[in-house]
């Protein structure tokens, strides 16, 4: 975040009262970050209900018009905030996301942001997503499971709000989180969680078949 080209950034580090070195590492950059004109950074460490509860908290604390939300192991491209801020000024989007550079032990690959003919997670890139603060407050993450981000995006999409995927790398994602674990149990869990979102919003069972195929291919190739 220190190297972002956009001048005015309010940055919150939301930590769930962890016992590791998260707070001390974040604190070591605090003075340098706050010394940059137009920048402010705050660190909050207190018990929460997980990642999406922390993201909801960040949206409530923010003062800007748009909010980007990224996890500790991931990082933005230097022009990420500027790209998404300028896009918002032109388009006044509710939700926008870019492509991500996926970092793996075997090299990097680009996951391209698209809308696609079907509304699926295949082209949804949460680490590269920015939303208007108003939308994040109106549609908070429901705190149901690890796919709360897709639940949020689906709700916004089906309510007819303006969404804008752009095929430009916005962030770098470290492969190896909850959504990448290889086991039949984890694949089945992901399938059930995402189908639960489709069902919740009255979407066709065809989406379940599409996701089943996606998880099968993912299980074989990873």
Regions found by a protein language model. Give the residues of each.
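Conserved short acidic donor-positioning loop in nucleotide-sugar-dependent glycosyltransferases
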Residues: 1, 16-17, 49-50, 72
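Acidic donor-binding segment of Leloir-type glycosyltransferases
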Residues: 2-44
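Acidic donor-diphosphate engagement hotspot in glycosyltransferases and nucleotidyltransferases
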Residues: 22, 55, 76-83, 107, ...
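Glycine-rich, basic loop-to-helix element that forms the pyrophosphate-binding segment
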Residues: 37, 44-62
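Conserved nucleotide-sugar donor-binding catalytic segment
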Residues: 114-189, 193
């Amino acid at each position: 975040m220190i190297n972002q080209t956009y001048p005015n950034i309010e940055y919150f580090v939301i930590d769930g009262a962890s016992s590791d070195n998260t707070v001390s590492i974040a604190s070591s950059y605090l003075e340098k970050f706050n010394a940059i004109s137009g920048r402010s950074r705050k660190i909050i460490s207190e018990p929460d209900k997980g990642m999406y509860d922390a993201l909801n908290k960040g949206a409530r604390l923010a003062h800007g018009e748009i909010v980007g939300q990224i996890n500790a192991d991931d990082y933005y491209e230097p022009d990420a905030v500027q790209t998404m801020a300028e896009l918002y000024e032109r388009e006044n989007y509710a939700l926008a996301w870019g492509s991500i550079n996926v970092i793996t032990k075997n090299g990097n690959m680009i996951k391209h942001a698209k809308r696609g003919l079907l509304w699926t997670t295949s082209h949804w890139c949460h680490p590269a997503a920015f939303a208007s603060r108003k939308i994040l407050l109106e549609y908070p993450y429901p705190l149901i499971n690890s796919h709360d981000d897709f639940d949020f995006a689906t709700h916004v999409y089906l309510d007819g709000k303006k969404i804008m995927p752009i095929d430009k790398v916005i962030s770098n994602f470290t492969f190896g989180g909850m959504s990448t674990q290889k086991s039949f149990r984890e694949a089945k869990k992901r399938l059930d969680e995402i189908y639960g979102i489709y069902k919740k919003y009255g979407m066709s069972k065809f989406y379940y078949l599409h996701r089943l195929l996606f998880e099968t291919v993912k299980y074989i190739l990873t």
